[in-house]
Each structure stands twice: as structure tokens, then as C-alpha cells.
């Protein structure tokens, strides 16, 4: 059996190798749940949080072992999208960030080391920039929701898994690369 139900948090984390917290996206809830997991889990166990925007430095404040806590943000839907953004907090042991990345890579995910604790991390910030532009075009009656969704779905949405947005522009710049595109 791979799926087990526990009657308490203590029972849920007593014989594990890793904990992935998935509490609601409210800072006070994340802080309390991480502190409870930290108290109940053996001290050598790494604790990952699925937060989509909070810094680990904000969430690890009540943990007795904050060095073992990392953001481990899977991208939805996680059964299809391999990305897991991994970033430590101010008190996180950098070796445990490496461990978490290796863990996710070993289970077929793509563990992306985020070098800074940015609100929303990397993927959500890039996605939100595009979303802001889409909302701007809709508000100004420049495009419809359907046009924008179709444009991304059948255009860059298909290309970006191969090249990503920056490599796409670098290649489009020809011999001068992205520098030529910026001129």
C-alpha cells in the first residue's frame, strides 16, 4: 500500500523520509502547520511547503528546526507539469535545498533552484506578467478572453516548452541574438 491515513499529524509524520505541506494559502495557517510538523517529525526529515507565494523566511519563524524547511512549490496540475520551484529561507541549510532538488528530480519532476526569495517565485511572476498584459488588453477592448487564450494556447504556449521565452527571442535575433532583438 502506498496510501495511508493517519489519525493525527504525529502519526502521519513519524515514519516518513520527507514531508510536503499543502495547507491553505494563508500565511498564519502555513506558519502554524509548519511548526506542528517541525515539532512532530524526526529532526532529520526535510519539510517542504507547497506555498505558491510566501517566503520560507516568513513561514519558518515558529520552527525549532528551521534549517530543514524549504519551499517546494509544484506547478499545477502536478501530475502533468514537472516543475517544482525549490527555495530556502534565511535559516534553511543550503545542503537541504540540494537534497530537495535531488529528491524531486529522482521522482521525475524538474526541481528548479530559485536563487532568491521572491514573492511568487519565478514561474508565477512570469505568468502573472503575461496575465497583467492580458487583463490590460481586455480592459482596453483590444482583445477578447477567447482571443488571448487561443493566441497563447496555439502559439507561444506550444513553443515555450521547447525553448522558453528568452531562448526564443535569442534565436529570433539571428547572429546578434537577443541583443539584436533589443536594438
Q: How does the language model describe each region?
A:
Residues 1-47, 54:
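Rossmann-like NAD(P)-binding element
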Residues 30, 79-80, 130-131:
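N-terminal alpha-helical segment
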Residues 39-42, 64, 102-110, 136-140, ...:
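Generic secondary-structure signature for well-ordered alpha-helical cores
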Residues 49-125:
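Rossmann-fold dinucleotide-binding core
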Residues 117-183:
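Helical "substrate-binding/catalytic lid" subdomain
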Amino acid at each position: 500500500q502506498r496510501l495511508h491515513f493517519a489519525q493525527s499529524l504525529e502519526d502521519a509524520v513519524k515514519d516518513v523520509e520527507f514531508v510536503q505541506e499543502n495547507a491553505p494559502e494563508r500565511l498564519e495557517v502555513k506558519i502554524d502547520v509548519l511548526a506542528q510538523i517541525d515539532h512532530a517529525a524526526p529532526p532529520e526529515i526535510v519539510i517542504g511547503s507547497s506555498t505558491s507565494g510566501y517566503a520560507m523566511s516568513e513561514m519558518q519563524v515558529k520552527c525549532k528546526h528551521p534549517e530543514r524547511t524549504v519551499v517546494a512549490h509544484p506547478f499545477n496540475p502536478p501530475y502533468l507539469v514537472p516543475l517544482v520551484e525549490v527555495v530556502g529561507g534565511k535559516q534553511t541549510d543550503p545542503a537541504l535545498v540540494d537534497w530537495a532538488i535531488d529528491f524531486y528530480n529522482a521522482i521525475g519532476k524538474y526541481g528548479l533552484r530559485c536563487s532568491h526569495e521572491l514573492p511568487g517565485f519565478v514561474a508565477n511572476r512570469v505568468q502573472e506578467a503575461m496575465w497583467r498584459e492580458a487583463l490590460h488588453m481586455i480592459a482596453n477592448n483590444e482583445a477578447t478572453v477567447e482571443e488571448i487564450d487561443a493566441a497563447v494556447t496555439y502559439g507561444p504556449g506550444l513553443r515555450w516548452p521547447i525553448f522558453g521565452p528568452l531562448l526564443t527571442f535569442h534565436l529570433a535575433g539571428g547572429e546578434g541574438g537577443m541583443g539584436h532583438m533589443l536594438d
